[in-house]
Regions:
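General helical secondary-structure elements
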Residues: 6-11, 19-20, 52-55, 63, ...
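Generic alpha-helix initiation/capping and coil-helix boundary signal
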Residues: 19, 30, 36, 46, ...
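Generic N-terminal simple sequence motifs
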Residues: 3, 12-15, 44, 124, ...
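Short, well-structured segments within or immediately adjacent to enzyme catalytic domains
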Residues: 60-275
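N-terminal leader/signal peptides at the extreme start of proteins
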Residues: 1-29
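N-terminal cationic amphipathic segment used for targeting or macromolecule association
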Residues: 7, 16, 35-42, 47-51, ...
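Residue-level signal for well-ordered alpha-helical scaffold segments within enzymatic catalytic domains
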Residues: 4, 37, 44, 48-52, ...
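Amphipathic alpha-helical segments typified by the pilin-like N-terminal helix
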Residues: 24-64
Length: 275
């Protein structure tokens, strides 16, 4: 018998590595904490920049809104005997000074200019930082808007007494630098432009308490549009307080929500009567 020899085949048996030599596939607690800390640092660096960019975008939109309002008024006036849309109540009272509401006649007129008053987030009648406006009040009826509007005031209260005074509201008599609308909130003492104690239901807002003193630092500024149709950002340092004075020296209407000491009030009242 012939012997048959088979070649020996040496096979290599793979053996699992020892546990202490295995590849690591997880972070240690220290490494995880380091990663979290890095993410937190990056977030702290990026979030303020993102917030600033968002605020800048809102300011730009607000500026565009006010510019549209100014252009719309300049379109309205030439077709209406050079008068701007009135900022007063629909009842025709000669003393009422309402700038934050639009009555049905004004709503119809602005709609014809493409400035539709509606309760939606893209409304041209409010700042993007006040998305709740405009608000419709069916009991009056009127729309509360998000801007202060100063155009077309046919009468105002005189600083030396509670009686009507003529107002140069024609566009041709106005200076281009006069503020037409502004992104601000005014302060009242329970009435809109009338002295305390007035009981007219169409003037008093019974559910509106007197505003308290402003807390914290003053704002950086605000957007304003002007009679010439332009609009720009105005730093707070360049603003001044617009106040309606009663005959007894009390304030009725405040442009900036800050309670001033009596000495300052007296000086401002004197300056108000001696421009």
């Amino acid at each position: 018998m012939q012997n048959t020899f088979s070649p020996l085949v040496r096979t290599r048996i793979s053996r699992p590595n020892a546990p202490w030599k295995s590849r690591r596939c997880a972070f240690t607690l220290i490494e995880l904490l380091v990663v979290i800390a890095i993410i937190a640092i990056l977030a702290a660096m990026l979030l303020p920049a993102l917030a600033a960019a968002k605020e800048k975008a809102k300011r730009t939109q607000c500026l565009n809104n006010l510019r549209q309002l100014a252009i719309g008024q300049n379109t309205y006036a030439p077709d209406n005997s050079d008068y701007l849309l009135p900022a007063r109540d629909g009842g025709g009272s000669p003393d009422v000074f309402v700038q934050v509401c639009l009555n049905p006649p004004e709503v119809s007129a602005t709609a014809a200019l493409g400035l539709v008053v509606s309760s939606n987030a893209a409304s041209v009648w409010t700042c993007p930082n006040r998305p709740g406006f405009p608000i419709f009040e069916p009991s009056y009826p009127q729309w509360d808007i998000g801007y202060q509007y100063f155009g077309g005031i046919t009468n105002w209260l005189n600083e030396v007494g509670n009686f009507a005074a003529n107002s140069p509201v024609r566009l041709g008599r106005s200076k281009g630098s006069w503020t037409l609308a502004a992104d601000c909130v005014c302060k009242i003492d329970g009435t809109w432009g009338l002295p305390q104690g007035t009981t007219r239901d169409d003037v008093i807002y019974s559910n509106t308490p007197q505003h308290g003193s402003k807390q914290g630092s003053p704002p950086q500024g605000g957007n304003q549009s002007f009679v010439d149709g332009s609009a720009r950002w105005v730093p707070f340092q360049q603003m001044y307080r617009l106040t309606t004075w009663n005959a007894d020296g009390s304030r009725i209407y405040y442009m900036y929500q800050e309670d001033l000491p009596p000495a300052v009030n007296n000086v401002l009242q004197y300056l108000h009567g001696h421009p």
